[in-house]
Amino acid sequence: NDTLVSDTANFGNLPWREVFTDPQLQSLIETGLKQNTDLLSAAQNVKAAEASLMSARLAYAPSLGLSPQGTISSFDKNAATKTYSLPVTDSWQVDLFGQLLNSKRNAQVTLKQMKAYRQAVQTQVVSNIANMYYTLMMLDRQLEITKATAEILKKNAETMEAMKDAAMYSINSAGVEQSKAAYAQVLASIPDIEQSIRETENALSTLLGEAPHAIKRGELEAQVLPTELSAGVPIQLLS
């Protein structure tokens, strides 16, 4: 599994550690590269393909065989003479139809495909972890702003109602009810945001190969990303 972590490469021309500099995010990516089930499965497929290629190469080597032989002879009623030999024989499979060569080529193609697949899975794991991590920070910020907005609207509704009761500035009931409705609408959105946070944390935990749990994270304002990044996530994010 260590090779999966050390086998990291570029986001465009940048190592992912330079792209994602948040220590918490780096730790999550390392965990994902070690424990993600899809990635571990892809690594096993690469090992199986390597073993298949080795087997195809060994098919070119001669097979060795031991053929122990023995004889017993007796002349003129003398004591029997025992003779033993242990010859080593070798044989080569005659590849009349190129079967060995085709087998080797197929194994090479399979190995390349499995390595490409593993690299694609690694790329997807890193990008998904980063995406969910930043989503969590954006949801945190959204929750913070929503709570602050709800508090402002609550005070505004209370102030307008007090002014109406005191018959100040021609505040009518419709204006008060409108301010209360705005407060209630914003307040009702808070549980939805909190639910989105929990669902995103659970999804990220699953991606990391762990049971659902709270995810430690930084703040959105503290994130620093390169100013120029090409669109999309290139396959060589990990190589």
Residue ranges and their predicted role:
Residues 48-52, 183-186:
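A short structural micro-motif
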Residues 109, 116-235:
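Periplasmic alpha-helical coiled-coil/stalk elements that build and connect Gram-negative outer-membrane
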